[in-house]
Amino acid sequence: MARHETSFPEILDVAALRARCDFIASAHAEQREPMRRALLAAFKEANVAGRAKARELLAADGAGIKCAERISWLQDQLITLLHDFVLNQVFDAAKAPEASRIAVTAVGGYGRGTLAPGSDIDLLFLLPAKKAVWAEPAIEFMLYILWDLGFKVGHATRTIEECIRLSRADMTIRTAILECRYVCGSAALANELETRFDHEIVRNTGPEFIAAKLAERDERHRKAGDTRYLVEPNVKEGKGGLRDLHTLFWISKYFYRVKDSADLVKLGVLSKQEYKLFQKAEDFLWAVRCHMHFLTGKAEERLSFDIQREIAEALGYHDHPGLSAVERFMKHYFLVAKDVGDLTRIFCSALEDQQAKDTPGITGVISRFRNRVRKIAGTLDFVDDGGRIALAGTDVFKRDPVNLMRLFHIADINGLEFHPAALKQVTRSLGLITPHLRENEEANRLFLSILTSRRNPELILRRMNEAGVLGRFIPEFGKIVSMMQFNMYHHYTVDEHLLRSVDVLSRIERGLEEEAHPLTAMLMPGIEDREALYVAVLLHDIAKGRPEDHSVAGAKVARKLCPRFRLTPKQTEMVVWLVEEHLTMSMVAQTRDLNDRKTIVDFAERVQSLERLKMLLILTVCDIRAVGPGVWNGWKGQLLRTLYYETELLLSGGFSELSRKERAKHAAHMLEEALADWPKKERQAYVRLHYQPYLLTVALEEQVRHAGFIREADRAGRTLATMVRTHDFHAITEITVLSPDHPRLLTVIAGACAAAGANIVGAQIHTTSDGRALDTILVNREFSVAEDETRRAASIGKLIEDVLSGRKRLPEVIASRTRVKKRSRAFTVTPEVTISNTLSNKFTVIEVEGLDRTGLLSEVTAVLSDLSLDIASAHITTFGEKVIDTFYVTDLVGSKITSENRQMNIAARLKAVLAGEVDEARERMPSGIIAPTPVSRVPHGSKTTKAET
């Protein structure tokens, strides 16, 4: 067990601090408490100065490992000086016999000789078999000093015998002792532990340790999110992070008995180039981690949005066209994480080969060693090695580079996993993927077969991407490998998103998504050209990170690649169109009024055919589903289905005002029949309350619930009432509000929801013929248990009633809730306002875009009301930190807003609100609107609002 081989005198003048300790001892020889305070002050000063110097040097040289070593060395010196002071000055044990002395050793990450600024200090105090009476009090004194210095100290006090016994049964303790490093005290005691541990624990238990460490790694990945491409990665514990490199080192030290990772080159486990990759990856990850700890002042391991921009700046990244500095930094991070995955695969391959030679027949998590090798029908280049495809020879790829594609194709059609040695050879053969191979007809045929496989194409494509083949074979794809988008909407890197999109498509086709996506599941078997659809799904975001709009640029990439994949001109045109329009259906569904005929007509003109409509719907579903957890919900699906059905009617010639009136008449009849237990006159009068949009867009089951709700409120004489219901599948909660209509009603309801901490994800807002509003507000679900969520919804409903009735004043309740979300501070969204009179025949359409915040919808609608605008429908769409709100409005007499001066005033007022400036409209929010005279509405008869998160 060796101390640090390198000294860092620039971090700490050890001699000067030792002299100061001696002075403190002599000055306070008989006064323990003053001595303790003086010692604490001296150590605190030295620690602060040393760490500040380490931070300064990190900023200057960018050397991550060196920074971690400097801090570890500093810690060693402080502990050594503390140990010597305590034994010599406090307990007078300096002359104690060697046999009674203790040893202080570092374990865990500190034991490796590296320490992050905010990390725990893990210590193992070794006691001799016959401990001295002063041993434990001395250890306790040291620990209290370290704690008072602000260190988080993990510690254990054991004899060597206890260490050996516990490490046999506990793999965590075994790993800690494996990394044990002598710091101070009895070197003989530390060396004895090392020798006994090596002989009694490590010897002949390699496979057991390897299996446990790899199983532990898999479980860690599962908990952290089993992808290295989460856009807020855990630098320490995440996939492709430092812990993965540490696991390789633990196994190396345990199995190969190496002291340094450089020894792996001598053993032939890693090539010189791979070892350099190991060093670069480790140094980069350490630099990131140290900067994170210094910046946050704590052991922050998640590279969150809040700090990514500052870390990028600290590491010297700059903006480039199409990619910001933070996006360039994060792309580098994910490429390094991918390198760690490559190294893990190469290492496990070498490990398996070594174990197969040494101990044939061992089985475990790492592999099935040397199962019987079998031939694979139709090929002489590959074999089946225990259910994994392996190479039949060392020159398989060099002899025929197309075999780089055949490997993955044969694995797919035979349902085989991949032997790590085969993937290692793939990584080492990437130079064979040349322009000639990219144009090879057979190679492209094999790739298209893999992409459109009816088995599990995402799995094979993922292996190709991890091995580096996908980015080499399709250079345009290589450009977006590991690329992140600096926003809260996208959860994964671009390449990860595309692979997940293909997986969603495959699952839909295999019938695994019928419950979640009934319409797409029904349409998929009838798709005429599944090849074009799969290619479009893979390519839809391939041009991200370019200065040009990625949909337009992506269409150009698709036009270039499709002929290479041997798609026909007709297929190519379909793919090009799908890529260029891949955002259209989502944006129309979420930001436009689907009850406005011009919305459907304009969308149908862009789509032009039923086949395009079907394929665009499926692509849209795949795209949204693959963005990340919680982005898709049933409400979003309902919007897309509505847009699909309305457009399908128009494209098939069935859409007309007459058919719409007939459908509304039929819906009214169905509602009347559903209320058959009501007196005839009462049910007829009730049905006459509702306009066409309500009858056509609200499900009959909901209409019946509303009928009971309104009837009960009327009988109780309540002009204001609320009703709540939770939806497990949609992951939303409904709050239905019955109230007298009012121009500011949406403002007040949205404000009350914001004040209650509820995030609006959708709304269905309708006006009845007797001047009342029937609004169903949809909010994100917070609790998994229905009873808890119902209670929460009821409290929100109560707050809405209190605000509407004037019992509580809206500005005050909003003010208490409008603290800016911490995560949102990391982002900037330029406020934009667009006013159009061409998107609707009846209404002026106002679209606002800005940084989301609590109460924003309430503020925006307050401004619109203050400007004497009547909101016919509103569509609130949130993409992470960015909100896009669209309002269909008229003036108070039902006309469009055509005056340029008035449009400019509207835009200016809205931009001010989006920018967070105080607007007088907010101060004029009504205290309550329960008793106003009903306002006459524009003749469309019903307001509708959509919102999404």
UniProtKB/Swiss-Prot annotation:
Gene3D superfamilies: 3.30.70.260, Beta Polymerase, domain 2, cca-adding enzyme, domain 2. Belongs to the GlnD family. Residues 926-949 are annotated as: Disordered. PANTHER family: BIFUNCTIONAL URIDYLYLTRANSFERASE/URIDYLYL-REMOVING ENZYME, BIFUNCTIONAL URIDYLYLTRANSFERASE_URIDYLYL-REMOVING ENZYME. One of its GO terms (biological process) is nitrogen fixation. Modifies, by uridylylation and deuridylylation, the PII regulatory proteins (GlnB and homologs), in response to the nitrogen status of the cell that GlnD senses through the glutamine level. Under low glutamine levels, catalyzes the conversion of the PII proteins and UTP to PII-UMP and PPi, while under higher glutamine levels, GlnD hydrolyzes PII-UMP to PII and UMP (deuridylylation). Thus, controls uridylylation state and activity of the PII proteins, and plays an important role in the regulation of nitrogen fixation and metabolism. Residues 378-733 are annotated as: Uridylyl-removing. Residues 1-377 are annotated as: Uridylyltransferase. It comes from the Bacteria. GO terms for molecular function: [protein-PII] uridylyltransferase activity; phosphoric diester hydrolase activity. Keywords: Hydrolase, Magnesium, Multifunctional enzyme, Nitrogen fixation, Nucleotidyltransferase, Repeat, Transferase. PROSITE patterns: ACT, HD. HAMAP family: PII_uridylyl_transf. This is Bifunctional uridylyltransferase/uridylyl-removing enzyme. InterPro entries: ACT-like_dom_sf (IPR045865), ACT_dom (IPR002912), HD/PDEase_dom (IPR003607), HD_domain (IPR006674), NT_sf (IPR043519), PII_UdlTrfase/GS_AdlTrfase (IPR013546), Polymerase_NTP_transf_dom (IPR002934), UTase/UR (IPR010043). Has four distinct domains: an N-terminal nucleotidyltransferase (NT) domain responsible for UTase activity, a central HD domain that encodes UR activity, and two C-terminal ACT domains that seem to have a role in glutamine sensing. Residues 734-816, 845-926 form the ACT domain. Residues 494-610 form the HD domain. Uridylyltransferase (UTase) activity is inhibited by glutamine, while glutamine activates uridylyl-removing (UR) activity. Its EC number is 2.7.7.59, 3.1.4.-. Disulfide bonds: none annotated. Its cofactor is Mg(2+). It holds the Pfam family ACT. It catalyses: [protein-PII]-L-tyrosine + UTP = [protein-PII]-uridylyl-L-tyrosine + diphosphate; [protein-PII]-uridylyl-L-tyrosine + H2O = [protein-PII]-L-tyrosine + UMP + H(+).
